[in-house]
Amino acid sequence: MAVTTYIVDKDGNQANAASVTKPSDRHFRGAWTLDGSVIAEDLATAKEIFKDKIREVRKPLLEAEDVVYMKALEADDATAKTNSVNKKKALRDAPAAKAITDAKTIAELKAAWDTSVLGASPYA
């Protein structure tokens, strides 16, 4: 008895995995939509997944920056406090980046990862 694997898209549609064209990676698996025998990625849903990934990555970065700020506060180091505040603002603003909003393709969305703020891209 052969086992058949089915792929289910974000809307609950399903197709035989052996008979569909799939995206090259699974980064935005939650954004997959079935269009005949092709699995496409819904860009709006992919953008939300992308923003959630940013939030996941920035959480420990914000926590670490809180420590930097507290040390600067204790040392009364105005420059370090300003730098820390600016870095935390950049981290908080990362999900609202214009490059994410303006992305028209999945490739553009992946390229919107700001390595200067968030570090290495999980999409590289």
Functional labels for PLM-detected ranges:
Residues 1-124:
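A preference for well-ordered globular domain cores
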